[in-house]
């Protein structure tokens, strides 16, 4: 039954993106005029490029604790991705035939970042900078007409010169047809994912299109309810089609998390998005045993899996359908 529930949800999401083709066509034909038209329609936004003063004021208003957290994340992400840098290969055989394999950076990349996710920008722009990409364009929508201070700080820290305040399918269309970047990366809702699928071939995209974010959490009686609820809320704020699932053999954990999540929603500025996402795509699953938990996770195939259990070994070597596993 679980796979049927998930399939129905995905089908409903696909039906919502039928207007993407029209948006792409209009932007390709009319340029910024069409971009502004759709921004006004969907976001009440009529300003698609921020001024230097706006960026300065946004960064100036940023909490020092947030700056410290971003700086910490930047250094850690940079250190990790520097380890991924590959070397060129050169081979010469006994007849002096030369074969060379060279790694060259793309000339330009467009990074789509949902309204309030500075971490997504960090995790996309840092590898691009390390690879040697010279031109990076950021597409990041405004929220209620305002820039996101944290994202503007990351953009400045990483040396991004081109920023468009555009979201949804119109942002992908702009990156592909107006900014004309070589490749588009970054997470987004179903409209963004569908737009990236349709422009692929005219512009590069990730090998696996980054659609709505999703997390599945395995918890037991010793798990921290606050940590579980915060993780679910963090994924749900990505968009209304994000999926958050909690699996446990302990009914009390499921009940406590449900109540705790409802209470902490009041503290979030974007509680409307989180609440709608959880109501549409949240799921609490009671499992009778470990095998049922493992089976459920392998059916769900989550982007992110968190094993918040005392004994992780009984799960991690039997789960093969998960993008990343946090222990």
Regions found by a protein language model. Give the residues of each.
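Conserved small-residue-rich beta-alpha loop and adjacent elements
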Residues: 91-153
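Glycine-rich phosphate/diphosphate-binding loop of Rossmann-like nucleotide-binding domains
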Residues: 131-146, 220-269
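N-terminal Rossmann-like NAD(P)+-binding subdomain of aldehyde/semialdehyde dehydrogenases
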Residues: 1-107
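Short acidic-hydrophobic, aromatic-tinged amphipathic segments that line or gate anion-handling sites
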Residues: 1, 162-167, 284-289
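Short loop-to-beta-strand entry elements in the cores of soluble alpha/beta enzymes
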Residues: 208-219, 235-258, 274-285, 302-310
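Conserved NAD(P)+-binding/catalytic subdomain of aldehyde/semialdehyde dehydrogenases
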Residues: 159-243
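C-terminal core of ALDH-fold dehydrogenases
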Residues: 290, 298-327
